[in-house]
Amino acid sequence: MTMGDKKSPTRPKRQAKPAADEGFWDCSVCTFRNSAEAFKCSICDVRKGTSTRKPRINSQLVAQQVAQQYATPPPPKKEKKEKVEKPDKEKPEKDKDISPSVTKKNTNKKTKPKSDILKDPPSEANSIQSANATTKTSETNHTSRPRLKNVDRSTAQQLAVTVGNVTVIITDFKEKTRSSSTSSSTVTSSAGSEQQNQSSSGSESTDKGSSRSSTPKGDMSAVNDESF
């Protein structure tokens, strides 16, 4: 048989494996499998389809990865407790240095016994303080406000209004009648003016009479002197 008659043994052709991971692509630099929608690698930001002849690794990302790998674990919480306990131990030493007068002042402040504190709950104390504050403010308001003159105090009508836990009493007064007061004042003023006019006219008449009576006496005295 010649060379041409030889036949190559029949081999089954390689069939393409079913691509189970269609759409995913591996990065040529970091070999990370990215999704089909990604245009760049999600780790090293390398574009899809770049060659690996001269790979350009991002130095910042490498530094971050190294820092994460060799990052020191967070310190345990026991150290914090020790730090808190240290100043507590130092406090008694500082308290010893304080003069006894300061300690006496602190003891004098605690005059109220514990039994009284238990008897008076904080809610009642707050309510008493608020009531005292309201009474003080009401007293200051009453003292500062001037009283009205044209008001009859005899005619007073009170109206109580309650809003929640607060009750407000409103007092209404009527004005004084101005007609009688004005007429009496005008009469008294006119009578006073007439009296002033009469007194002024009487004083003028007395002055004239005194001047007339003084002149003839002077003349008579002069005539008597001449006769002598």
From Swiss-Prot:
Modified positions (Phosphoserine) are S99, S123, S127, S130, S227
Name of a matching Pfam family:
YAF2_RYBP
Q: Where is this region: Disordered?
A: 1-21, 47-157, 172-228
The answer on whether this UniProt entry bears the keyword Repeat reads no
Polar residues: compositionally biased ranges: 124-143
Residue numbers spanned by region Interaction with GABPB1 and FANK1: 143-226
* PTM comment: Monoubiquitinated.
State the tissue distribution.
Answer: Expressed in embryonic stem cells.
The listed locations are: Nucleus; Cytoplasm; Nucleus, Nucleoplasm
Cross-linked sites for Glycyl lysine isopeptide (Lys-Gly) (interchain with G-Cter in SUMO2): K77
From which residue to which do the RanBP2-type zinc fingers run? 21-50
Give the record's GO CC terms.
cytoplasm; nucleoplasm; nucleus; PcG protein complex
Domain of life (superkingdom): Eukaryota
Does the UniProt entry include the keyword Metal-binding?
Answer: yes
GO terms, molecular function: DNA binding; transcription corepressor activity; zinc ion binding
Domain comment as written in the entry: Intrinsically unstructured in the absence of binding partners. Folds upon binding to DNA or RNF2.
Subunit composition?
Monomer. Component of repressive BCOR complex containing Polycomb group subcomplex at least composed of BCOR, PCGF1, RING1 and RNF2/RING2. Component of PCR1-like complexes. Interacts with PCGF1. Part of a PCR1-like complex that contains AUTS2, PCGF5, RNF2, CSNK2B and RYBP. Interacts with RNF2; the interaction is direct. Interacts with CBX2, YAF2, RING1 and RNF2. Interacts with ubiquitin and ubiquitinated proteins. Interacts with ubiquitinated histone H2A. Interacts with apoptin, DEDD, FADD, CASP8, CASP10, YY1 and GABPB1.
Q: What is this protein called?
A: RING1 and YY1-binding protein
